[in-house]
Amino acid sequence: MESILSCPIVSVNARVWRFWSFVLKHDAMRYISIIPVTVMTFFMFLDLGHSWGDFQDVIIKGYFAVLYFNAVLRTLILVKDRKLYENFMEGISKFYFEISRIDDHQIQSLLRSYTTRARMLSISNLALGAIISTCFTVYPMFTGVRGLPYGMFIPGVDGYQSPQYEIIYLVQVVLTFPGCCMYIPFTSFFVSTTLFGLVQIKTLQRQLQTFKDGIGSHENKNADLQVIKLIQDHKRIIAYVSELNSLVTYICFVEFLSFGLMLCALLFLLNVIENHAQIVIVAAYIFMIISQIFAFYWHANEVREESMNIAVAAYSGPWVELDDSIKKKLLLIILRAQQPLEITVGNVYPMTLEMFQSLLNASYSYFTLLRRVYN
C-alpha cells in the first residue's frame, strides 16, 4: 500500500480513494459516501418521472441524474474490483520505480514530464470539480424561487415546504462533495494510467534505438540479451494495456451511451431557451461533457498511435551489424507492433479520435432531427 501512495503518478487519486475507503482500506467512510449518494440518485430518477412534460426541466434533471448514476456506478465497480485495482496500481508503482532507475537522461526527462502532467491533471480536475459543484449548489439561491440543486422526488414528502426544503437542500449540498470524489478521480485515474502507458511505450522506443550503445561490434551475446529484455518489456506493456482495458472498458461503454444522449439533449435545450443565465449554465454542462469524453479518447488514442511507433523505433535502431538471430527477434517486435494496443468501448470499438468525432457527429445529427421536429 505504501508503494502505491508513494508513486507520484497515481498517488493523488489513490489517496482520494483511500480517504473514502474505496480501495486500500475498508471502514465506515465507504458507506457514509456510497449509500446516501445512491439513495439521492434514486430519488433524482423518481423526480424525472414526475417532471415529464416539461422537456427543459427533464433535460436538466436528467443530466444530473445521469451524472450521479455514473458516479455511483464507477464507485460500485471500483469497490467490487478493488483487489484488481490495488494489484494494478501496485504494478504501476513497481514499474515506475524501475524506470526511474534507468540511466538515461532522455527517459528520466520523459518520466518527470508525464508525472507532472498526470499530477497536474488530477489536482486540477479535483479543483475544477469542487468549483463547478459549488456553482451547482448555490445557483438556486439566486433564481428568486425555491429550487433545489438537483431535482428530487421523495414519496410522501413535499420538498418545497419548510422545514423539509431546508433539510433537503442542506443534504444535497453535503452530498455534493462525496459525489464529486466518487466521479472525478476515476477520470483522473484513467488519464494517469494511460500517461504511464505512454511512458513505458516511449521508454521502449528509446531503448530500441540505443540498446547497442556501449556494446562492442563483436559482443553479439550482450546485444542478444538486451533484445530479449526489450521483448519482455514489450510483452509487459501489452499486458499492461490489456489489464487497463479490462478495468475501464464497460465504464467507458456506459459513458459512451449516456453522455452521447445527454449531449444531444443539451444541444437541443441550448437552442430553445432564451434566459441568458440558463444559456451560460447549459453551455457549461456541454463543455463538461465534451471535455470529459475528450480526455478519455485523446489519451487512449495516444496509446494506440505510440504503440504502433514501436515498429518504427525498432527499425531505426542499430540492427544492421547484428547477427541474423538477433535481427529475427527485432522482426518479431516489429510484427507485433503492427497490431495496435487499444483501449475499447465495451470491448467493441477502439477509443480513437475518429470514434470521438463519430460520437459528436451522431449527437449533432440527432440534435438537428429534434430541432426540426420541435420547429
From Swiss-Prot:
Signal peptide: none annotated. It holds the Pfam family 7tm_6. One of its GO terms (biological process) is signal transduction. Disruption phenotype: RNAi-mediated knockdown does not affect mosquito blood feeding rate. It is found in: Cell membrane. Keywords: Cell membrane, Membrane, Olfaction, Receptor, Sensory transduction, Transducer, Transmembrane, Transmembrane helix. GO terms for molecular function: odorant binding; olfactory receptor activity. GO terms for cellular component: plasma membrane. InterPro entries: 7tm6_olfct_rcpt. Its main location: membrane. The chain crosses the membrane at residues 32-52, 58-78, 125-145, 167-187, 250-270, 279-299. Belongs to the insect chemoreceptor superfamily. Heteromeric odorant receptor channel (TC 1.A.69) family. Odorant receptor which complexes with Orco, a coreceptor, to form odorant-sensing units, providing sensitive and prolonged odorant signaling and calcium permeability. Can sense indole, 1-octen-3-ol, 3-methyindole and an insect repellent DEET. This is Odorant receptor 10. It comes from Aedes albopictus (Asian tiger mosquito).
